């Protein structure tokens, strides 16, 4: 059996048809979250709190490599288990913090963690970070980190047909040439077949549709 154990059961979808609840974990938890839920069952609370401190430090952009090594040695955790614990806890908090407190209620947050099988005392520690006094500071750090990333300033594309090429299989095969310009001044050019471009259009349209549906559900939830 793997050291990570079997995946924990997950009992609801992004929106529970019975409760109208919006899941902060999405349609199903990521592999990192599922794995950490299994390992937390065998972790003592003292070690978990030290782990949380490291994760919060990482969210603030601190270099925690030495502290991670010290925790692994003092808690007798293998590199594999420690990596899973850190990645899963980091992902869990990030997913909770990306939603405003008005959209994610403490009770719903704790219910989802209970369904994953996370121990109750650890759920309390996670909830205190997601909804406690440190939340405004974590939100501020996340905003600063997000604003430092370049954004798309311009997007251009055109259809190109190669009439003559060294690769005969590409002869007369249309493709789409795209160019992205970012706010940091960099430009990226790439070429994709028409079929892949259509897949991209469909995927973007689907994501936008799901985002709009989620926003409407959150608005209805707040109005109720």
UniProtKB/Swiss-Prot annotation:
<dbReference type="GO" id="GO:0005737">
    <property type="term" value="C:cytoplasm"/>
</dbReference>
<keyword id="KW-0539">Nucleus</keyword>
<dbReference type="InterPro" id="IPR017920">
    <property type="entry name" value="COMM"/>
</dbReference>
<dbReference type="InterPro" id="IPR037357">
    <property type="entry name" value="COMMD5"/>
</dbReference>
<feature type="region of interest" description="Disordered">
    <location>
        <begin position="1"/>
        <end position="24"/>
    </location>
</feature>
<protein>
    <recommendedName>
        <fullName>COMM domain-containing protein 5</fullName>
    </recommendedName>
</protein>
<comment type="function">
    <text>Scaffold protein in the commander complex that is essential for endosomal recycling of transmembrane cargos; the commander complex is composed of the CCC subcomplex and the retriever subcomplex. May modulate activity of cullin-RING E3 ubiquitin ligase (CRL) complexes. Negatively regulates cell proliferation. Negatively regulates cell cycle G2/M phase transition probably by transactivating p21/CDKN1A through the p53/TP53-independent signaling pathway. Involved in kidney proximal tubule morphogenesis. Down-regulates activation of NF-kappa-B.</text>
</comment>
<feature type="domain" description="COMM">
    <location>
        <begin position="151"/>
        <end position="215"/>
    </location>
</feature>
<dbReference type="Pfam" id="PF07258">
    <property type="entry name" value="COMM_domain"/>
</dbReference>
<dbReference type="GO" id="GO:0005634">
    <property type="term" value="C:nucleus"/>
</dbReference>
<dbReference type="Pfam" id="PF21672">
    <property type="entry name" value="COMM_HN"/>
</dbReference>
<keyword id="KW-0833">Ubl conjugation pathway</keyword>
<comment type="subunit">
    <text>Component of the commander complex consisting of the CCC subcomplex and the retriever subcomplex. Component of the CCC (COMMD/CCDC22/CCDC93) subcomplex consisting of COMMD1, COMMD2, COMMD3, COMMD4, COMMD5, COMMD6, COMMD7, COMMD8, COMMD9, COMMD10, CCDC22 and CCDC93; within the complex forms a heterodimer with COMMD10. Interacts (via COMM domain) with COMMD1 (via COMM domain). Interacts with RELA, RELB, NFKB1/p105. Interacts with CCDC22, CCDC93, SCNN1B, CUL2, CUL3, CUL4A, CUL4B, CUL7.</text>
</comment>
<keyword id="KW-0007">Acetylation</keyword>
<keyword id="KW-0805">Transcription regulation</keyword>
<feature type="modified residue" description="N-acetylserine">
    <location>
        <position position="2"/>
    </location>
</feature>
<keyword id="KW-0963">Cytoplasm</keyword>
<comment type="similarity">
    <text>Belongs to the COMM domain-containing protein 5 family.</text>
</comment>
<keyword id="KW-0804">Transcription</keyword>
């Amino acid at each position: 059996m793997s050291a990570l154990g079997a995946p924990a059961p997950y009992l609801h979808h992004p929106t529970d048809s019975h409760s109208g609840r919006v899941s902060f974990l999405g349609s199903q938890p990521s592999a990192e979250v599922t794995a950490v839920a299994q390992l937390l069952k065998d972790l003592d609370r003292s070690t978990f709190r030290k782990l949380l401190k490291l994760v919060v430090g990482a969210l603030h952009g601190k270099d925690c490599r030495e502290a991670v090594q010290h925790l692994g040695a003092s808690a007798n955790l293998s590199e594999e288990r420690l990596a899973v614990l850190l990645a899963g806890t980091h992902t869990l908090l990030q997913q909770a913090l990306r939603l405003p407190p008005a959209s994610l209620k403490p009770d719903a947050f704790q219910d989802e963690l209970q369904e994953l099988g996370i121990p109750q005392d650890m759920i309390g520690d996670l909830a205190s970070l997601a909804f406690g006094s440190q939340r405004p500071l974590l939100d501020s750090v996340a905003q600063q980190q997000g604003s430092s990333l370049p954004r798309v300033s311009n997007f251009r594309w055109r259809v190109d047909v190669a009439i003559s090429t060294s690769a005969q299989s590409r002869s007369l095969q249309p493709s789409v040439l795209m160019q992205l310009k970012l706010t940091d001044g960099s430009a990226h050019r790439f070429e994709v077949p028409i079929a892949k471009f259509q897949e991209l259009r469909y995927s973007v349209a689907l994501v936008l549709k799901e985002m709009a549906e989620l926003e409407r559900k959150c608005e209805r939830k707040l109005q109720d």
